[in-house]
Amino acid sequence: MIHSRRWAAAAAALALLLTGCSSAPGAPALGAGRSEIIVQAGEDEIPGLQSTAEEYTRDTGVDVRFVQREINAQAISNFISQSPTGQAPDIIVSPHDNLGQLAANGVVAPVELGDSGEDFTKNAQDAVKYNGVSYGVPYGVESVALVRNNELTTAEPSTFDDLRADGHRVMKEQGVSYPFTVSQDPDAGDPYHLYPLQTSFGAEVFKREKSGEYTDELAMGGEQGHQFAEYLADLGKSGDLRTSMTPDIAKESFIKGDSPYHIAGPWDVAEIEEAGMDVTVLPVPPAGPEEARPFAGVRAFFVNANAQNPVAAQDFAANYLTRADAQDSLYESTGRPPASKTAIENISDDPLRTSYAEIATTALPMPAIPAMGAVWSFWGTAENGIVEGDGAPVELWDQMIANIEGQIQ
């Protein structure tokens, strides 16, 4: 999701790289016999892959060619249908939350990382596992954090109530409009951005095995969920949380100095920097008694189970994309906080993204299980209803739980 405008060099390099894409004149069909591998990646990722691809070709004689395509539901559907026919790329880049669907359809192959896997943060390693099997090479981890406008406040709130109190102080003393801003959606809600507050009450979305993998049993019901629902209702009643605050309104209000705090992911950093703001990135403080843990979205490389050049695809993924220089290069081209511990150390001169990367190490991987598809709509609608005061918070929450469980069954 990170904006690529800041990375101007990537755009210039891309024009050269695309001469090797399958869409270029004379490029071979994906299913043709070849001494090459095809990698499908996004516009901001291809420049960061080029040097690693060139090194691989020098070492092995196997060419690495790129297909530029942004990952969305249609791209995943196409990969699933084309993989068995030999028409899909050998490697794709995707958010990890598509892994459950890919693995269930048998279109991705396990990737053995060996010792190099230890350089990745634990949650990045966990995110690319499905049923105990590792399927991917992570490179970026994104989660939300608290961005503070240092010109309005230098407080470091230890609880979310402290944040609200400081936000109201700034509103009174400096005339800003909001105590904090956070992305919402008037129609669908936004449980993603509110998840750190929810987990601080101990109400994770699904229960997890000892290994950390998710089961399809909901964990956000019961007393912990009720406490979060009551807190949401209070946020809505006070006017601190507004369902009308769209992503653009939240970001623009913070950038123009109308809020001292902003809950957002690293995709907003480039515009904040362009505005010349003096900001600090902090963990979201807890609203409840436990640590506030946001979702982590892990960007990773996955190998086609039906790759036309499976040995080379596995070799490139496990032995080249895991290298420190490859991970550094991907950070430079995409701006995504790294999944590699070494790469995190190497960006110490970028304090904002370093903070995001460090905060993301404690984030919870977004569930990649199929049951997650039953959650979002009911979850967001229920949260909106609670914030808007459409009913008793506990009753609305319990109805949401019943609706989701009905869908999962």
Predicted regions and their residues:
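Glycine-centered hinge/linker elements that transmit conformational signals in sensory
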Residues: 212-244
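A structural signal for short loop-to-beta-strand junctions that line the ligand-binding cleft
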Residues: 80-81, 88-90, 117-151, 291-292, ...
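Extracytoplasmic/periplasmic solute-binding protein
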Residues: 135-139, 144, 164-217, 259
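Conserved C-terminal helix/tail region of periplasmic/extracytoplasmic solute-binding proteins
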Residues: 361-409
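Hinge/lid segment of periplasmic solute-binding proteins
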Residues: 96-143, 162, 281-282
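Extracytoplasmic/periplasmic substrate-recognition and gating elements
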Residues: 273-333
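Long, aromatic- and glycine/proline-rich binding clefts that accommodate carbohydrate-like moieties
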Residues: 128, 330-381
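Conserved N-terminal structural module of periplasmic/extracytoplasmic solute-binding proteins
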Residues: 2-98, 288, 403-409
